[in-house]
Amino acid sequence: MKILVTGGCGFIGSNFVRYILNKYPDYEIVNIDALTYAGNPENLRDIREDKRYRFVHGRIEDKNLVANALGDADYIVNFAAETHVDRSIRNSSPFLTANILGTHVLLEAVRTGSIKKFVHISTDEVYGALGSKGKFTEKTMLAPNSPYSASKASADLLIRAYYETYRLPTVIVRPSNNYGYYQFPEKFIPLMITNLLMKKPIPIYGKGENVRDWCFIEDSCAAIDNVMHNGKAGEVYNAGGNCEVENIELAKSILKIMGKSERHIKFVKDRPGHDYRYALDNSKIKRELKWRPSVKIEEGLEMTIRWYKDNEWWWKPLKERLSAESRGFWER
């Protein structure tokens, strides 16, 4: 079995590549990645020499590159995307190019090829914001509130149109917030962990009352694997972690695990269009595909913190580069 993975040097993508190669000894993966600021080949240092893995440097907007890399692949799993909300607020152009035009190129490749399934990794942010009650279902109307989420929602609608028009074997996965190993240190959880390891304060937007639904990366990889093999064409699957936590409470949990006081918290001005709450109803994927998250937040945070403590070689150069670029981004 052969899989074309796009964006496989990013956070979720690299964990998925490793997950698949570890689980399926006879699978092969071709990984296309543009190696933009968050794409890091060091994420896959341990499998570079694996004969089942091949890396292709390039952008998914490049039709010829995609066609050549696709070859006789059985599946495409599309992680390639610009994903940071704050960066999209400052400059949305890269998000439109990668997230919409890039998806279009992949869909055209599927339309003219013989792919068994095209799996697109979306986000819970396409649904917009929730109040204090209720959860997003797969039938919730899309109502994105940032340039980033608008670009992802646009890609989702394009995929829907290609399924309805051409009956392509497409499926969409909408995960909740992921956390775990190899996550770029501008994101909320690794930002807090690495700041504390460097004896720096941890910035929290507003009063820290925003709520996110968290899912450990290995659970998310298992969900995507399940959808790839068993998901029904034309469907959307919410892969939520069933773990809603206020940002401030999450920060306090990390401080407690790391033995730090709450004096390290620094409240900062809230960002524009900051969605109050995300929460995914994952009953469909549990019912139809028998997937459910297995790692509790306490266990996941402990494993994640331990990983960052043990892998300073990986995150410290990225952190220094962010500092040099004067990037003041703190949360997805």
List PLM regions with ranges.
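N-terminal Rossmann-like NAD(P)+-binding domain of SDR-like oxidoreductases, especially those catalyzing
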Residues: 1-178, 303, 308-311, 317-332
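The catalytic Tyr-centered alpha-helix of NAD(P)H-dependent dehydrogenases
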Residues: 140, 144-151, 181, 185-189, ...
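A glycine/serine/threonine-rich, flexible loop-to-helix segment
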Residues: 47, 134, 185-193, 269
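Short aromatic-enriched loop/helix-cap "lid" or pocket-rim segments at secondary-structure transitions
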Residues: 41-44, 130-133, 183-186, 250-251, ...
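Residues in well-ordered alpha-helical elements
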Residues: 64-67, 86, 93, 104, ...
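C-terminal substrate-binding subdomain of Rossmann-fold SDR/epimerase-dehydratase oxidoreductases
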Residues: 15-17, 29, 58, 196-332
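Hydrophobic alpha-helix immediately C-terminal to the catalytic Tyr-X-X-X-Lys motif of short-chain
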Residues: 154, 158, 162, 192, ...
